[in-house]
C-alpha cells in the first residue's frame, strides 16, 4: 500500500506524455511502466548510458533514441492524441511533435510486451556502475 501511495505522489507532478506512456504500456503490455520499467537495466528510467543489458533494456535504449530524434519538441511533456481501432493504437492529431512521441511510446510498449518472457529481475535497480561501456550509436 505504501508503494502505491509513493507512486501516486510521484505522478502528481508528471504531465504530458509520461502519463500517456504509462497508459500505453498498461494497454499494450498489460503491466505498469512505473513498477516494471522505471529502474531497469542501463536505459529504463531517467538517463541512460552504457550498453543495453537485455532485450527489455534495448526497448528503452531504442525509445531514448526515438525521443532524441523528435524534432522541435520536448518529448517528456508534450501531450498527444491516439485512438484504438480493433485493439490497435493509432497515433494521430494535428501536432506533428505529439504524433512522433506517440509513435515512440507505442513502439516501446509493443517492445515491452514482446519481451516479457525475457524480463530478468536481476536488472531491476541495476547499479549504474555496471553501465560504463561505450554506448552504441542510435
Curated annotation (Swiss-Prot):
Catalyzed reaction equations: a 1,2-diacyl-sn-glycero-3-phosphocholine + H2O = a 1-acyl-sn-glycero-3-phosphocholine + a fatty acid + H(+)
GO cellular component: extracellular region
Signal peptide: 1-16
Similarity remark: Belongs to the phospholipase A2 family. Group II subfamily. D49 sub-subfamily.
Protein's cellular compartments: Secreted
Positions of the catalytic residues: 63, 105
Tissue expression as described in the entry: Expressed by the venom gland.
Annotated organism of origin: Crotalus atrox
Keywords: Calcium, Disulfide bond, Hydrolase, Lipid degradation, Lipid metabolism, Metal-binding, Secreted, Signal, Toxin
EC code: 3.1.1.4
Cofactor binding, note field: Binds 1 Ca(2+) ion per subunit.
Any Gene Ontology biological process: lipid catabolic process
Organism domain of life: Eukaryota
Disulphide-bridged cysteine pairs: 42-131, 44-60, 59-111, 65-138, 66-104, 73-97, 91-102
Binding residues for Ca(2+): 43, 45, 47, 64
CDD domains recorded: PLA2c
Protein name: Acidic phospholipase A2
Assembly: Homodimer.
Function per UniProt: PLA2 catalyzes the calcium-dependent hydrolysis of the 2-acyl groups in 3-sn-phosphoglycerides.
Class of this enzyme: hydrolase
Gene3D superfamilies, alphabetized: Phospholipase A2 domain (1.20.90.10)
Cofactors required: Ca(2+)
GO MF annotations in UniProt: calcium ion binding; calcium-dependent phospholipase A2 activity; phospholipid binding; toxin activity
Amino acid at each position: 500500500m505504501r508503494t502505491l501511495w509513493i507512486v501516486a505522489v510521484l505522478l502528481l507532478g508528471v504531465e504530458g506524455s509520461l502519463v500517456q506512456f504509462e497508459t500505453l504500456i498498461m494497454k499494450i503490455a498489460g503491466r505498469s511502466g512505473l513498477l516494471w520499467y522505471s529502474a531497469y537495466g542501463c536505459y529504463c528510467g531517467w538517463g541512460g548510458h552504457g550498453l543495453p543489458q537485455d532485450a527489455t533494456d534495448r526497448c528503452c535504449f531504442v525509445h531514448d533514441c526515438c525521443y532524441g530524434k523528435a524534432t522541435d519538441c520536448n518529448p517528456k511533456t508534450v501531450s498527444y492524441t491516439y485512438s484504438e481501432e480493433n485493439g490497435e493504437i493509432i497515433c494521430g492529431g494535428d501536432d506533428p511533435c505529439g504524433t512522433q512521441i506517440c509513435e515512440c511510446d507505442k513502439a516501446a510498449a509493443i517492445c515491452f510486451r514482446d519481451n516479457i518472457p525475457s524480463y530478468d529481475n536481476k536488472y531491476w535497480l541495476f547499479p549504474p556502475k555496471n553501465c560504463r561501456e561505450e554506448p552504441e550509436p542510435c
